[in-house]
From Swiss-Prot:
EC number(s) stated in the UniProt entry for this protein: 3.6.1.15, 3.6.1.6
NCBIfam families, A to Z: PRK13662.1 (NF010183)
Record key words, sorted: Hydrolase, Magnesium, Metal-binding
Catalytic activity: a ribonucleoside 5'-triphosphate + H2O = a ribonucleoside 5'-diphosphate + phosphate + H(+); a ribonucleoside 5'-diphosphate + H2O = a ribonucleoside 5'-phosphate + phosphate + H(+)
Active site: R23
InterPro entries: DUF402, FomD-like_sf, Ntdp-like, SA1684
UniProt xrefs under Pfam families: DUF402
UniProt GO molecular function: magnesium ion binding; nucleoside diphosphate phosphatase activity; ribonucleoside triphosphate phosphatase activity
Cofactor(s) annotated in UniProt: Mg(2+)
UniProt organism field: Streptococcus pneumoniae serotype 2 (strain D39 / NCTC 7466)
Enzyme class: hydrolase
Protein name according to UniProt: Nucleoside triphosphate/diphosphate phosphatase
Keyword Metal-binding: yes
Length: 177
C-alpha cells in the first residue's frame, strides 16, 4: 500500500477484538506520514457509529497513529486549551480502504487543566472476558498505558504544546490552499 501524502484524505476505521466494526471517521486530512506513524487532522469530520448513528466532530483535532505503540492520540484544540483523548488500541494497519486499528476499550483523557483520567476500565474487563483477550495482550496493553502516561507526564510528542501548534498551523495552511 502506497502511503498517503500530505493533504490527502483518508478514512479511519476502528474495530473491536472480535472483528466487528466499531466506528468510522470519513475524510481525515493527512498532515505527515513516516514509515511508522501517521499524523492527521479531523475538523467537522463525519463519524459513523457501529449502530448507524452519525455525528460530526466539533473542533479541530490532531490525530496520531503509530505502528509500534498500542495507543493512538487525539489532541482536541479548544478555545480554552488542548484536551486529549487517548485510545488503548492495536498499532494501526493501512490498506486501500482505510487506516484500521482495534480499539481495546481503555482510554486516557487529559483535560485542559492537566487532570488525567483512566476511563472504561469496567468495559475493558467485560470485553476481556467476552472476547477472550489473552494474558499476553492484557500485559501489552497495561505496559503501553505506562508508556502513554510517561509521554503525557514528560510532554512528549503530541503532548507538547509546540507539536500541537506546528501541526495545527500546517493544517490551516493546507486547508486554505
Amino acid at each position: 500500500m502506497k502511503l498517503p501524502k500530505e493533504g490527502d484524505f483518508i478514512t479511519i476505521q476502528s474495530y473491536k477484538h472480535d472483528g466487528s466494526l466499531h466506528r468510522t471517521w470519513r475524510d481525515t486530512m493527512v498532515l505527515k506520514t513516516t514509515e511508522n506513524a501517521i499524523i492527521g487532522v479531523n475538523d467537522h469530520t463525519l463519524v459513523t457509529e457501529s449502530d448507524g448513528r452519525r455525528w460530526v466532530t466539533r473542533e479541530p483535532a490532531i490525530v496520531y497513529f503509530h505502528k509500534k505503540y498500542w495507543f493512538n492520540i487525539i489532541a482536541m484544540i479548544r478555545d480554552n486549551g488542548t484536551s486529549y483523548y487517548c485510545n488503548m488500541a492495536s498499532p494501526y494497519y493501512l490498506d486501500e480502504e482505510a487506516l484500521k486499528y482495534i480499539d481495546y476499550d481503555l482510554d486516557v483523557k487529559i483535560f485542559t487543566d492537566g487532570e488525567k483520567r483512566l476511563l472504561d476500565v469496567e468495559e475493558y474487563e467485560r470485553h476481556k472476558r467476552k472476547m477472550n483477550y489473552s494474558d499476553d495482550l492484557d500485559y501489552i496493553l497495561k505496559e503501553h498505558v505506562k508508556i502513554l502516561v510517561d509521554w503525557i507526564n514528560n510532554g512528549r510528542g503530541p503532548f507538547s504544546e509546540a507539536y500541537v501548534n506546528i501541526w495545527y498551523k500546517r493544517y490551516v495552511e493546507l486547508k486554505n490552499r
